[in-house]
Design a protein with these regions (language model features):
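Alpha/beta-hydrolase active-site loop
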Residues: 1-17
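Active-site nucleophile loop of the alpha/beta-hydrolase fold
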Residues: 48-57, 73, 103
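Catalytic histidine neighborhood in serine/cysteine hydrolases
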Residues: 90-106
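Gly/Ala-rich beta-loop-alpha elbow adjacent to hydrolase catalytic centers
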Residues: 25-34
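Acidic catalytic loop of the alpha/beta-hydrolase fold
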Residues: 74-79, 105-106
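Catalytic histidine-centered segment of alpha/beta-hydrolase-like enzymes
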Residues: 103-115
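Short beta-strand/loop motif that positions the catalytic acidic residue
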Residues: 64, 69-72, 76
Length: 130
């Protein structure tokens, strides 16, 4: 399935570029896959955009041991904003959360802000990510 595909890509990238520091990112369903893959891959950083908390992410999750950004719109019509906020704050060391006020699930008209927030987060992280 998708998790196995993600793990295979990570293994391939590490071998291809001889690089241990991988950054994982995913949007919606991809955020759930990236979060699950992080437990095996041990990324240098993780970005989850509109993670499907309460839909696909329903069980307790171990917090990845890396810098982690959660991006969420507060008008998401598919993923409940309050549920995501509670989930994020439930971790002993909560991930960084970027809220885009007024943004819906697909961030229509807000992709520039989304991009800027992710780039700012990654600029604070380890050098050498792939």
């Amino acid at each position: 399935g998708e998790l196995e595909d993600a793990l295979a890509v990570c293994a391939w990238a590490r071998q291809r570029w001889n690089c241990e520091a991988l950054w994982l990112a995913g949007f919606s369903f991809g955020a759930a896959i990236a979060l699950e893959a992080a437990a095996t891959v041990g990324p240098a950083a993780l970005v989850t955009v509109a993670p499907p908390v309460g839909r696909l992410i329903v069980t307790p999750v171990l917090r990845p041991d890396c810098p982690w950004l959660v991006v969420q719109g507060d008008r998401d019509e598919l993923v409940d904003f309050a549920t995501v906020r509670r989930w994020v704050s439930g971790f002993d060391a909560p991930p960084q959360m970027l809220v885009l006020p007024g943004a819906e699930h697909f961030f229509h008209g807000r992709l520039g802000e989304l991009r800027a927030g992710v780039l700012e987060f990654l600029a604070q992280g380890p050098v050498g990510g792939l």
